A protein has these predicted regions:
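NAD(P)+-binding Rossmann beta1-loop-alpha1 motif at the extreme N-terminus of oxidoreductases
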Residues: 1-56, 62, 66, 122-123, ...
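NAD(P)-dependent Rossmann-like dehydrogenase/reductase catalytic/cofactor-binding core
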Residues: 16, 196-264
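Short, conserved loop/helix-junction motifs that constitute active-site signature segments
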Residues: 24-25, 80-85, 102-105
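Active-site capping/gating segments
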Residues: 33, 111-129
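Internal alpha-helical scaffold of NAD(P)-dependent oxidoreductase catalytic cores
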Residues: 44, 99-109, 124-161, 172-210, ...
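Rossmann-like NAD(P)-binding element
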Residues: 56-83, 87
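ADP-ribose/adenylate-binding Rossmann-like module
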Residues: 84-96
Length: 264
């Protein structure tokens, strides 16, 4: 059986393992390594995840393995990598294929941008590959698909751009949810009821979005001189739409290497 090696044991690694370990353990032997991989042991025990913890000594043995990089981008060169991997799957924000290939020898490289909804196998993940090899590529993509959906984009810059739509986006949506909950409290609902109503609204909205564009949903809710259009006019006047776009732009710019420029 092939080996899938997780290098890193933080929030994203734990989210992916929680959401995908049942599928992945049928296809791979799971390994976890990093500077102090023993830190993940209580989590593995709590979630009943079968994975081998491999202490880091002088080098990480990556030979003939599928290697999933899930640590901080600036730690890429802190490790020594021994051998040639079959595939390197990188969730390192802002780290391009050149930096990856300079640091790690592999037959295949895949750059991806998952999110914390991986813990429910609901991540929306943009991916791009280098040196595509059909059989290796298929297995690497199956890893991504085990914790959500996989959207293949045309180049690595677009993977970084997807932080706007599926990376930082969940934090921005959490701010929206928190604001709506507080609005309910301000109008008289208790905190528990307000949060419950907001949660169900998000579930309903997600279902609507599967079939309809956002603009269509707005049109269905708004009536002439109605309550919703009155509220929307305030949001537009306050520049909320533009603020979201600008926030996403800032997040992408912060993450993207300085030599990344998309053609206009």
């Amino acid at each position: 059986m092939e080996i899938l090696q997780f290098i890193g044991y933080g929030n994203m690694a734990q989210a992916i393992l929680e959401g995908a370990h049942e599928i992945l353990s049928k296809r791979f032997i799971l390994e976890i390594t990093g500077r102090n991989p023993e830190k993940i042991a209580p989590f593995l025990q709590e979630k009943n995840i079968q994975a081998q913890i491999v202490p880091y000594k002088d080098a990480i043995d990556i030979h003939q393995k599928f290697v999933f990089l899930l640590f901080k981008p600036y730690n890429l060169k802190d490790f020594n990598y021994q051998g040639q991997a079959k595939s390197v799957l990188s969730a390192l924000a802002g780290v391009g294929f050149k930096a990856l290939s300079d640091a790690i020898n592999s037959l295949h490289y895949l750059k991806c941008m998952p999110n914390v909804a991986s813990k429910f196998a609901l991540s929306s993940t943009a991916v791009c590959e280098k040196s595509p090899m059909p059989l290796i590529s298929q297995k690497a993509l199956s890893v991504i698909e085990s914790f959500g959906n996989c959207v293949r984009v045309g180049n690595e810059e677009l993977v970084d751009a997807s932080v706007a739509t599926n990376g930082s986006a969940l934090a921005f949506l959490s701010l929206v949810a928190s604001s709506l909950k507080d609005a309910g409290i301000r109008e008289g609902l208790n905190a528990r009821d307000s949060l419950e109503l907001v949660k169900m609204s998000f579930k309903g909205f997600a279902k609507l979005l599967e079939k309809e564009r956002p603009e269509m949903i707005i049109e269905q809710i708004c009536t002439p001189k109605g309550a919703t259009i009155e509220g929307l006019s305030v949001l537009e006047k306050k520049g909320v739409r533009g603020a979201f776009i600008k926030a996403c732009q800032k997040s992408v710019k912060k993450m993207r290497p300085k030599n990344y420029t998309l053609k206009k």
